[in-house]
Amino acid sequence: MEHIKNVIERYKHVRNMKMLQQAYQGKYAFVGIGNHSTNNLYPVLNYLHVPLKYICCKTPGKLHLIEGVFPHVRATTSLDEVLTDEDIKGVFVSVSSKAHFSIASRVLAHKKALFIEKPPCLNAEELRRLIELQKQTQVLAMVDLQKRFAPAMQILKKKLQGSKGTKTYNLKFLTGAYPEGDALLDLFIHPIDCVVYLFGKAEVRCVEPIDEHTVMLVLKHADAIGVLELSTDYTWSDAKESMTINTNKGIYSLEQMETLTFQRKPHRFCGLPLEKVLMHVNVTAELFGRNNFQPLMQNNQVF
């Protein structure tokens, strides 16, 4: 028993040292301090211990308030001050969509890594120019389409690579009314990005808008076809995001990016479903799920 305790303590020590050694080599800056940033992005940076040196905003009256909340950060209205600081290795940007292209261009031109809230620009020409600038400077640039990096999505991506034939899927993204912005660019872009990430480039086979709140889509990929319901005609108190994928091996179900399950299909003989003749026991395997009982990193929504 003493030997087992020593092994456990040794493991805990190694794990703790590994975490403490993961230090950042540079400083970072954040442009913008709106509601989305303070509610969603700053908490993640704090959780990851990202060393922010600057917070940049356009309102001088906010500067002393920002430094009161973030005592180790310099608040400024000058983007030039941020971009000319050699300590700054990367910049997070989350401001008005109209200002994204201008700020992103300047960040890339100064060869700083860029993480920018969607959309990074407002038209195809601006997007082309940003892509060219990123290629010229060879710096890391990323748009905030973070759902594709969720653990459940990563697992699902690997599982789908082992399936054969044409896959079919149904996706529902249902929220309440969204009068404060563009639902397509602010909300619906996330599920659309997810299916492109999972199945590759998509061809729009059918688009059916319903009033100004719902879009029904049929998308065709190289080896998959899916139906999407994207709507702001439901409720925020019970907003839903779910996907069901039918493959040759079985059925994958993804709920709220928090639960991923797999149900194997019953066998067939010469096209005949044996479950109609023999007893079939449905077995659902949980491939990913959060356990709120244990306060571990994997069970934290920030993770």
Language-model features and meaning:
Residues 54, 89-90, 168:
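Short, Asp-centered acidic motifs that coordinate Mg2+ and/or phosphate
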Residues 116-117, 141-143, 254:
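Hydrophobic residues in well-ordered beta-strands that form the structural core
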Residues 98, 121-181:
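A contiguous active-site-proximal alpha/beta segment in oxidoreductase catalytic domains
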Residues 1-70:
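N-terminal Rossmann-like dinucleotide-binding module
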Residues 2-4, 270-303:
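C-terminal helical cap and adjacent loop that interface with cofactors, partners, or active-site loops
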Residues 2-12, 186-261, 300-303:
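Contiguous beta-strand/loop segments that form the cofactor/metal-binding neighborhood of enzyme cores
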Residues 70-131:
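Beta-loop-alpha module in the N-terminal Rossmann-like domain of NAD(P)-dependent dehydrogenases
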